[in-house]
């Protein structure tokens, strides 16, 4: 899950996320789904913002690749928060 700066235009969110998702594809992983929830109210302010643009991304990749994606997202100033969760294997 990624929470982006609410001042971004919502139409530019998906193309800007694609640049980060290329890290997954380049290392042999797959991007299963990108679900942009849109602008939502935050439970508490983050960097003086009361809202954020939420995006949920489902990927299959090696742990090192996911760590690199998380690192690059955290370096971007338009990303307020990231949360990486591993799903259970079925």
Swiss-Prot record:
<keyword id="KW-0687">Ribonucleoprotein</keyword>
<dbReference type="GO" id="GO:0005737">
    <property type="term" value="C:cytoplasm"/>
</dbReference>
<keyword id="KW-0689">Ribosomal protein</keyword>
<dbReference type="InterPro" id="IPR020815">
    <property type="entry name" value="Ribosomal_bS6_CS"/>
</dbReference>
<keyword id="KW-0832">Ubl conjugation</keyword>
<dbReference type="GO" id="GO:0070181">
    <property type="term" value="F:small ribosomal subunit rRNA binding"/>
</dbReference>
<keyword id="KW-0699">rRNA-binding</keyword>
<dbReference type="GO" id="GO:0003735">
    <property type="term" value="F:structural constituent of ribosome"/>
</dbReference>
<dbReference type="GO" id="GO:1990904">
    <property type="term" value="C:ribonucleoprotein complex"/>
</dbReference>
<comment type="similarity">
    <text>Belongs to the bacterial ribosomal protein bS6 family.</text>
</comment>
<dbReference type="InterPro" id="IPR014717">
    <property type="entry name" value="Transl_elong_EF1B/ribsomal_bS6"/>
</dbReference>
<dbReference type="InterPro" id="IPR000529">
    <property type="entry name" value="Ribosomal_bS6"/>
</dbReference>
<comment type="function">
    <text>Binds together with bS18 to 16S ribosomal RNA.</text>
</comment>
<dbReference type="Pfam" id="PF01250">
    <property type="entry name" value="Ribosomal_S6"/>
</dbReference>
<protein>
    <recommendedName>
        <fullName>Small ribosomal subunit protein bS6</fullName>
    </recommendedName>
</protein>
<feature type="cross-link" description="Isoglutamyl lysine isopeptide (Lys-Gln) (interchain with Q-Cter in protein Pup)">
    <location>
        <position position="33"/>
    </location>
</feature>
<dbReference type="InterPro" id="IPR035980">
    <property type="entry name" value="Ribosomal_bS6_sf"/>
</dbReference>
<keyword id="KW-0694">RNA-binding</keyword>
<keyword id="KW-1017">Isopeptide bond</keyword>
<dbReference type="GO" id="GO:0005840">
    <property type="term" value="C:ribosome"/>
</dbReference>
<dbReference type="InterPro" id="IPR020814">
    <property type="entry name" value="Ribosomal_S6_plastid/chlpt"/>
</dbReference>
<dbReference type="GO" id="GO:0006412">
    <property type="term" value="P:translation"/>
</dbReference>
């Amino acid at each position: 899950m990624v929470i982006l700066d609410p001042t971004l235009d919502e139409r530019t969110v998906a193309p800007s996320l694609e640049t980060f998702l290329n890290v997954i594809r380049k290392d042999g992983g797959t991007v299963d789904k990108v679900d942009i929830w849109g602008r939502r109210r935050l439970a508490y302010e983050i960097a003086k913002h009361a809202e954020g643009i939420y995006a949920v991304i489902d990927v299959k990749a090696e742990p090192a690749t996911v760590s690199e994606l998380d690192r690059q997202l955290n370096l971007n100033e338009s990303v307020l928060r990231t949360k990486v969760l591993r799903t259970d294997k079925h």
